[in-house]
A protein has these predicted regions:
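Alpha-helical tetratricopeptide repeat
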Residues: 1-224
């Protein structure tokens, strides 16, 4: 599941103690890829995206065939991207509500509106480019996971979800097919493939996939 339970203070303390232990290991042996990976996992569990990504990258630098480091780095990069976007959305909502207070009238006010619009457009383009770059980084990590371990079903599933986020439904369906081929009872893959097919106008097969997901236990997770 993608839902994560909040950690208790005691659990957080355990992870930070573990981080200290891994740090000591790294100090003794700076080339220990497993220590970087372990420390990354602890950072991941305390929701420190940046440090987790940094440590997964350190593990990969020392062991370029470290499949799970690529996979978890992709997961963390996506979580960081989603968090950043949610924070920006909150800020944009606040800015929008605040902008309603500006009731200036006249040429100077109109000029300011035009200038703000121009800045907003440039800002939106920069955000789109940054998001595209971040999606590409995540995609490359999943590509590497699949290259190193072609049977890793969740790499196909997560890559398919990323492609849906990019609205590349055709490519997403191909990846969902690969996931389902490797795990014929993967309910979430049927469900998401059904949504992707519906987005393409493939209604009959889309509904069939949603029904299959329901048979496999997804029905109660997605009530009407």
């Amino acid at each position: 599941t993608n839902e994560e339970a909040a950690l208790t203070e005691d659990q957080i303390a355990v992870h930070f103690a573990s981080i200290d232990e891994y740090s000591a290991e790294i100090e003794r042996d700076p080339n220990n890829a497993n220590a970087y990976f372990g420390r990354a996992m602890d950072f991941m569990l305390v929701q420190d995206f940046s440090e987790a990504i940094k440590n997964f990258s350190e593990a990969i630098e020392r062991d370029p065939s470290f499949t799970m480091a690529y996979f978890n780095r992709a997961v963390e990069r996506y979580k960081q991207l989603m968090y950043t976007q949610s924070q920006q959305a909150s800020k944009d909502t606040y800015d929008l509500s605040g902008s309603g207070m500006n009731l200036n009238i006249g040429k100077s006010a109109q000029s300011q509106v035009n200038a703000n619009t121009s800045v907003d457009l440039r800002s939106a383009m920069l955000k789109d480019n940054k998001r595209a770059y971040e999606h590409e980084q995540i995609m490359r990590d999943y590509d590497m996971v699949i290259k190193l371990n072609p049977g890793f079903v969740y790499a196909y599933f997560n890559r398919a979800n990323l492609r849906c986020a990019q609205r590349d439904f055709r490519a997403a369906i191909v990846d969902y097919n690969e996931a389902i081929e490797r795990d014929p009872e993967f309910a979430e893959a049927y469900y998401n493939r059904g949504l992707a097919r519906l987005s393409q106008g493939d209604v009959n097969r889309g509904i069939a996939d949603l029904s299959k997901a329901g048979e496999l236990g997804m029905l109660n997770l997605h009530p009407n």
